[in-house]
């Protein structure tokens, strides 16, 4: 009797099908941004009150809201801002914050350091948008907080809250990519409603930029018409654009105001000008933003009459533009004691410059290969092949001319190949230069000149007194002063479309980009 055959093992199950193209995450710890846009029912409760935590959690994940919800938030916030005075009056205790510049994830850190808006009074000094890539998230979140806490959270206007700068820098493009031009226009209307200054505790004038030769009293500010695009000159422009002089407190000139050569508009004001304004208006100090600070803040020379710093600058965007390596700070004022709380930058999602997509980013590689092939195709032509069958009809000069034309074409394509090669090989340096030039474009001729030109690239300031040094390919910006020098051209008011030349230069003007949880406290009585 034959032995039974051994049982055969069941065949192994087929392997699971591969994930759809693009569905696999290279960095698996980083989740996809949610594709669902929050609806009205999710953002607002039955009474029309915003659910701020729902919105915050969604925005932190890079989520978006329905366009109609974005418009509702912006318009409701604007309606509250329109009812406020041009110079609002606020009381201590309060936390004063400087520039944010689209750094939404650092704004979340700011509220951790400064305290919950539910039980902390806040005053923001402007510049919520531009340069950073999460500006619309900053606007939506701050406007929702304004709707929730209209009497304890206050927003002033900065020089970037205008059509001119948001078109020139990144905010308009961001709105169109993430939402639409309708959302951008709604933001512009809301920005026109932002107050220009705040009087804190009847002791401090809080403003984005500083003083104006046309403003002598607080009533001069109260009388300004703020519901418009800021002009290129005048008191409204000065409140948003002016700066303390570079030798503030040690001036050699006795002129209170001088032309602001850094901004290309408005003025520098000096220590005597500030002291005179404080004395005439019975104030202790001026608190302003508008300038990046290595420590996140700066206290200037003390007033001789009060012994208090005559001027304080606060800046709340840490590691500005991802290159400044600066700390950020907020100012907490309570019981006549002023504390400065510093904080470092938080991790954030990465965007290519100017919201570039990966296909555009890959074009230099593709272009290099295509031009390389063209050069090779054209280069295999011998002198004999450059002649036609009817060569006897042409004289020697014509044949030489045809060969020279072909050679010129080969040289032109070779030059193009060189551009693409530099773009690909030096992409990191190109990124750095793009981020630190106002239009997001490299200086003309840099790429065609190859590596040597890239290493010595310069960006001319509008008045061209001095060119700003560029970055060499292997170099990384490693100090605050170096970043500030490279970014100096972006501090200027950009040229306006209706620019006219006056006195040899434009009368138009520009602006001013691993989480550490440590905070520092410094007190000034």
Swiss-Prot record:
InterPro entries in the record: Calcineurin-like_PHP_ApaH (IPR004843), Metallo-depent_PP-like (IPR029052), MPP_PP2B (IPR041751), PP2B (IPR043360), Ser/Thr-sp_prot-phosphatase (IPR006186)
Species of provenance: Rattus norvegicus (Rat)
EC number: 3.1.3.16
Family membership: Belongs to the PPP phosphatase family. PP-2B subfamily.
Protein name: Serine/threonine-protein phosphatase 2B catalytic subunit beta isoform
Gene name of the record: Ppp3cb
A cellular component annotation (GO) from this entry: protein-containing complex
Subcellular location: Cytoplasm
Cofactor binding note of this UniProt entry: Binds 1 Fe(3+) ion per subunit. Binds 1 zinc ion per subunit.
Molecular-function annotations in GO: calcium ion binding; calcium-dependent protein serine/threonine phosphatase activity; calmodulin binding; calmodulin-dependent protein phosphatase activity; enzyme binding; protein dimerization activity; protein phosphatase 2B binding; protein serine/threonine phosphatase activity
Free-text tissue specificity from the UniProt record: Expressed in kidney (at protein level). Expressed in hippocampal presynaptic termini (at protein level).
Keyword annotations from UniProtKB, A to Z: Acetylation, Calmodulin-binding, Cytoplasm, Hydrolase, Iron, Metal-binding, Phosphoprotein, Protein phosphatase, Zinc
């Amino acid at each position: 009797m034959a032995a039974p055959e051994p049982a055969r093992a069941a065949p192994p199950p087929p392997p699971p099908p591969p994930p759809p193209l693009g569905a696999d995450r290279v960095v698996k710890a980083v989740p996809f941004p949610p594709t669902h846009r929050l609806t009205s029912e999710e953002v607002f409760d039955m009474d029309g009150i915003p659910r701020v935590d729902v919105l915050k959690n969604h925005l932190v994940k890079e989520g978006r809201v329905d366009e109609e919800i974005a418009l509702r938030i912006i318009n409701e916030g604007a309606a509250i801002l329109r009812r406020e005075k041009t110079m609002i009056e606020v009381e201590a205790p309060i936390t004063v914050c400087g520039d944010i510049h689209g750094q939404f994830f650092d704004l979340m850190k700011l509220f951790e350091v400064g305290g919950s808006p539910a039980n902390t009074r806040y005053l923001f000094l402007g510049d919520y948008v531009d340069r950073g890539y999460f500006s619309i998230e900053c606007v939506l979140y701050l406007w929702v907080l304004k709707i929730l806490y209209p009497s304890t959270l206050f927003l002033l206007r900065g020089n970037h809250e205008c059509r001119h700068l948001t078109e020139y820098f990144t905010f308009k493009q961001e709105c169109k990519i993430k939402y639409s031009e309708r959302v951008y226009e709604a933001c512009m209307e809301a920005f026109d409603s932002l107050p220009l200054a705040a009087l804190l505790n009847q002791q401090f004038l809080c403003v984005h930029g500083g003083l104006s030769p046309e403003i002598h009293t607080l009533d001069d500010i109260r009388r300004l018409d703020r519901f418009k695009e800021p002009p290129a000159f005048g008191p409204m422009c000065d409140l948003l654009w002016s700066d303390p002089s570079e030798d503030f407190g040690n001036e050699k000139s006795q002129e209170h105001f001088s032309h602001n050569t850094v901004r290309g508009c408005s003025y520098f004001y000096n220590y005597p000008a500030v002291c005179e304004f404080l004395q005439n208006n019975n104030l202790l100090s001026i608190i302003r933003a508008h300038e990046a600070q290595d420590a996140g803040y700066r206290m200037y020379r003390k007033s001789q009459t009060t012994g208090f710093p005559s001027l304080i600058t606060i800046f709340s965007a840490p590691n500005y533009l991802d290159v400044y390596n600066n700390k950020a700070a907020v100012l907490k004022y309570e019981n006549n004691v002023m504390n400065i709380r510093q904080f470092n930058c938080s991790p954030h999602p990465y965007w290519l410059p100017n919201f570039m997509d990966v296909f555009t980013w890959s074009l230099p590689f593709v272009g290099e290969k295509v031009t390389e092939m063209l050069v090779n195709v054209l280069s295999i032509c011998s002198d004999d092949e450059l002649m036609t069958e009817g060569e006897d009809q042409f004289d020697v000069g014509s044949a030489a001319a045809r060969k020279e034309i072909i050679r010129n074409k080969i040289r032109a394509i070779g030059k193009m190949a060189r551009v693409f090669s530099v773009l690909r090989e030096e992409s990191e340096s190109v990124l750095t230069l793009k981020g630190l030039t106002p239009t997001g474009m490299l200086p003309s001729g840099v790429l065609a000149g190859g590596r040597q030109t890239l290493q010595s690239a310069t960006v001319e300031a509008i008045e061209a007194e001095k060119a700003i040094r560029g970055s060499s390919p292997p170099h990384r910006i490693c100090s605050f002063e170096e970043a500030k020098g490279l970014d100096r051209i972006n501090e200027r008011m950009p040229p306006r479309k209706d620019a006219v030349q006056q006195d040899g230069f434009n009368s138009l003007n520009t602006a001013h980009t691993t989480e550490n949880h440590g905070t520092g406290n410094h007190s000034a009585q």
